[in-house]
């Protein structure tokens, strides 16, 4: 399983609908291929609570290690990915909702005074919710209450969820507006990073050179390497290999030969594909097919 995305890395999945733009679900990180969901973004705000295990959650150029009973606020339109940590299974609660669910209609006081100052602030792509911080505990508790309401679906569950999300937002708003500025990437840098990731997503099955990627975002090769490594905590080559292996998994499961799969995901040598596959998956392509 993997997240479905458009060419620009935007997630295709609907998070609720126009009349009630909220989605609540319990996910398992190990359900995703390689124990990771790939980089994507969506206009919805996302709240995460770790129910068991651990996860590395990356948002733009920041990395957060989330343990059981900790959580994360992920802002609207941020590029993010999640990676399993250790051998234990990791289950987490995900609550996604569109900002308009908070403010109602464009240019309202709620939007301009309380929502936009947070969702449009590039300094706050995310922040961690600690289980031992009183204010954070309250937010995490409200998140759990939302899940319970979602599961039971009382007759007024939409109203109850709206009230709890407004309480959560009030806490988040006060927290963000009272904190000193953080050193985060600018909107232009985020746009460049999205373009680089999207380019590899669109061309992973072709021969891609550093020149191609640098030219696509209009920077020199050395700056291209430095920029990607700084913000993604991995080299361009490492990300491309990771992406290609991810793309190979459903093909192998469908019964494609190793040789054909290698070519379909951008490897010119089946032997090299097998070598990289084993590095990431700890087994050969044939062993993966059998299991």
Role assignments for model-derived ranges:
Residues 69, 223-228, 272-273, 277:
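Short hydrophobic/aromatic patch on the recognition helix
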Residues 198, 202, 207-214, 219, ...:
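Terminal helix-turn-helix DNA-binding modules in bacterial transcription factors
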Residues 150, 169-172, 176, 200, ...:
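Hydrophobic recognition helices of helix-based DNA-binding modules
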Residues 138-152, 192-203, 247, 251:
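Solvent-exposed, amphipathic alpha-helical segments
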Residues 108-167:
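Amphipathic alpha-helical segments enriched in hydrophobic/aromatic residues interleaved with Lys/Arg
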Residues 1-71, 77-79, 86, 110-113, ...:
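Generic protein-terminus/edge-of-domain signal
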Residues 135-138, 142, 164, 188-196, ...:
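N-terminal positioning helix adjacent to the helix-turn-helix/winged-helix DNA-binding module
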Residues 77-102, 110:
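Ligand-binding loop in jelly-roll beta-barrel domains
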């Amino acid at each position: 399983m993997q997240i479905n995305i458009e060419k620009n890395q935007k997630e295709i999945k609907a998070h609720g609908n126009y009349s009630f733009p909220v989605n609540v679900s319990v996910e398992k990180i190990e359900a995703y291929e390689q124990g990771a969901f790939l980089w994507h973004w969506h206009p919805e705000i996302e709240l995460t609570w770790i129910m068991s295990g651990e996860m590395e959650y990356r948002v733009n150029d920041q990395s957060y290690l989330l343990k059981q009973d900790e959580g994360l606020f992920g802002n609207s339109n941020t590029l993010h990915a999640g990676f399993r940590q250790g051998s234990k299974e990791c289950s987490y609660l995900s609550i996604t909702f569109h900002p308009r669910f908070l403010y109602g209609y464009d240019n309202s006081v709620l939007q301009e005074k309380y929502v936009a100052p947070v969702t449009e602030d590039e300094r706050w792509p995310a922040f961690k919710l600690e289980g031992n911080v009183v204010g954070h505990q309250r937010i995490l508790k409200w998140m759990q209450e939302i899940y319970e309401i979602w599961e039971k679906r009382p007759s007024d569950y939409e109203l109850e969820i709206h009230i709890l999300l407004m309480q959560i937002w009030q806490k988040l708003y006060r927290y963000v507006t009272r904190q000193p500025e953080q050193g985060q990437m600018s909107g232009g840098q985020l746009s460049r990073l999205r373009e680089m990731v999207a380019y590899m997503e669109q061309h992973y099955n072709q021969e891609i050179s550093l020149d191609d990627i640098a030219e696509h975002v209009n920077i020199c090769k050395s700056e291209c390497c430095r920029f990607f490594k700084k913000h993604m905590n991995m080299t361009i080559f490492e990300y491309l290999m990771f992406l290609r292996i991810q793309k190979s998994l459903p093909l192998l499961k469908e019964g494609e030969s190793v040789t054909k799969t290698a070519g379909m995901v951008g490897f010119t040598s089946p032997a090299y594909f097998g070598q990289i596959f084993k590095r990431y998956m700890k087994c050969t392509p044939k062993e993966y097919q059998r299991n």
